[in-house]
């Protein structure tokens, strides 16, 4: 039997791309471009400064603080606060700022703890606020100062202060020789160390402890939790500098 040869056409395939494939190609190009942009953003966010700026723009809004009259008690920024436990989301925001913005720094993860009816309990309430901002668990404090039913005694002796610092794992802030902090200096301390306990003289001329949580250059003020008066209070920076307990080396403490 003879098999007839079959002719095969070897004409080259057309290189023309069907018109309906164009949107797919464009979509792939866009996806590749977006992926490249994402990689670039991830790369550019590798520095602490860029991460701080991204955190600020995504977490913080612009907070306006009304500066109170000199010598008066301080205005609350928010009525929402916790009364003992630590925050579930330890979310901190850091210094904002390009050349056209006013720097704002505020730690939002610091729980508020009141001293309640304890007349001399500000130091222990502050220890709880700072401690619970970084870890759960009981605070050591100074149990020996809790005697009787009237609450704790104050931190009167340097030996008490030293034991308090040791028990709570606190560190002193190096105070400037000129006895004056700028917004930038306080913002850098908060960014590096978190909330800071500070001792100061109140408008009633009594020594007291509170917790520094933020600064706002636009209103020339600081933000702080006060165990007696409430959370998220504002104080003029000049007032803070005048009233800080500069005469003692433990005027400012952090974890």
Swiss-Prot record:
Superkingdom of the organism of origin:
Bacteria
Q: Is-annotated flag, keyword Ubl conjugation?
A: no
Q: How is it modified after translation?
A: Autocleaved inside plant cells upon activation by cyclophilin. Cleavage is crucial in subcellular location and in eliciting HR. Inhibited by cyclosporin A (cyclophilin inhibitor).
Residues at the site labelled Cleavage? 71-72
The outcome of changing residue 208 to A is:
Abolishes the normal in planta processing, RIN4 degradation and fails to elicit RPS2-dependent defense response
Q: Name one GO cellular component term.
A: host cell plasma membrane
Q: Which GO terms describe its molecular function?
A: cysteine-type peptidase activity
Region annotation (Determinants of cleavage specificity) maps to 70-71
Question: Which residue intervals make up region (Disordered)?
Answer: 1-50, 76-100
Q: What GO biological process terms are annotated to this protein in UniProt?
A: proteolysis; symbiont-mediated perturbation of host programmed cell death; symbiont-mediated perturbation of host transcription
Which parts of this protein are propeptide? Answer: 1-71
Compartments where located? Secreted; Host cell membrane
Keyword Protease (UniProt): yes
Q: What's the reported outcome of changing residue 69 to S?
A: No effect in cleavage
Question: Which EC numbers does the record give?
Answer: 3.4.22.-
**Effect caused by changing residue 150 to S:** No effect in cleavage and fails to recognize RPS2 plant cells
Residue ranges under compositional bias (Low complexity)? Answer: 86-98
Identify the keywords attached in UniProt to this record, alphabetized: Autocatalytic cleavage, Host cell membrane, Host membrane, Hydrolase, Hypersensitive response elicitation, Membrane, Protease, Secreted, Thiol protease, Virulence, Zymogen
| Active-site annotation | 122 (nucleophile), 208, 226
The record's Pfam families line, in alphabetical order, gives: Peptidase_C70 (PF12385)
Q: Which family does it belong to?
A: Belongs to the peptidase C70 family.
- Give the protein's function: Effector protein involved in gene-for-gene resistance in plants expressing RPS2. Its thiol protease activity is required for the degradation of plant cell RIN4 and consequent activation of RPS2 during bacterial infection. The activation of RPS2 is sufficient for the induction of hypersensitive response (HR) and plant resistance. Cleavage of RIN4 by AvrRpt2 also interferes with RPM1-mediated resistance activated by either AvrRpm1 or AvrB. Contributes to virulence in plants lacking the resistance protein RPS2 promoting pathogen growth and disease symptoms.
Q: What else is known?
A: Only naturally present in strain JL1065.
* Subunit and partners: Interacts physically with plant cell ROC1 (Arabidopsis single-domain cyclophilin) and RIN4.
Task: State what protein this is by name.
Answer: Cysteine protease avirulence protein AvrRpt2
Organism, as annotated: Pseudomonas syringae pv. tomato
Q: Name the encoding gene, please.
A: avrRpt2
């Amino acid at each position: 039997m003879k098999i007839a040869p079959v002719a095969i056409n070897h004409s080259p395939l057309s290189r023309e791309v069907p018109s309906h494939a164009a949107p797919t190609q464009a979509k792939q190009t866009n996806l590749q471009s977006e992926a490249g942009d994402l990689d670039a953003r991830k790369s550019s966010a590798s520095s602490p400064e860029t991460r701080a700026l991204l955190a600020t723009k995504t977490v913080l809004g612009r907070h306006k603080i009304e500066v109170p009259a000199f010598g008066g008690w301080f205005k609350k920024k928010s009525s929402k606060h916790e009364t003992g436990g630590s925050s579930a989301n330890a979310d901190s925001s850091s210094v904002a700022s390009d050349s056209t913005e006013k720097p704002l720094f505020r730690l939002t993860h610091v729980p508020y703890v009141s001293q309640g009816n304890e007349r001399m309990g500000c130091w222990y309430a502050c220890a709880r606020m700072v401690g619970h901002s970084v870890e759960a668990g009981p605070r050591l404090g100074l149990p020996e100062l809790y005697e009787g039913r009237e609450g704790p005694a104050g931190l009167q002796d340097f030996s008490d202060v030293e034991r308090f610092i040791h028990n709570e794992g606190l560190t002193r802030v190096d105070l400037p020789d000129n006895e004056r902090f700028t917004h930038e200096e306080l913002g850098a301390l908060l960014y590096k160390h978190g909330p800071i306990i500070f001792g100061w003289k109140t408008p009633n001329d009594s020594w007291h402890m509170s917790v520094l949580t933020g600064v706002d250059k636009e209103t020339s003020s600081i933000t702080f939790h006060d165990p007696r008066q409430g959370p998220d209070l504002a104080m003029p920076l000049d007032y803070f500098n005048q009233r800080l307990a500069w005469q003692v080396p433990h005027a400012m403490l952090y974890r």
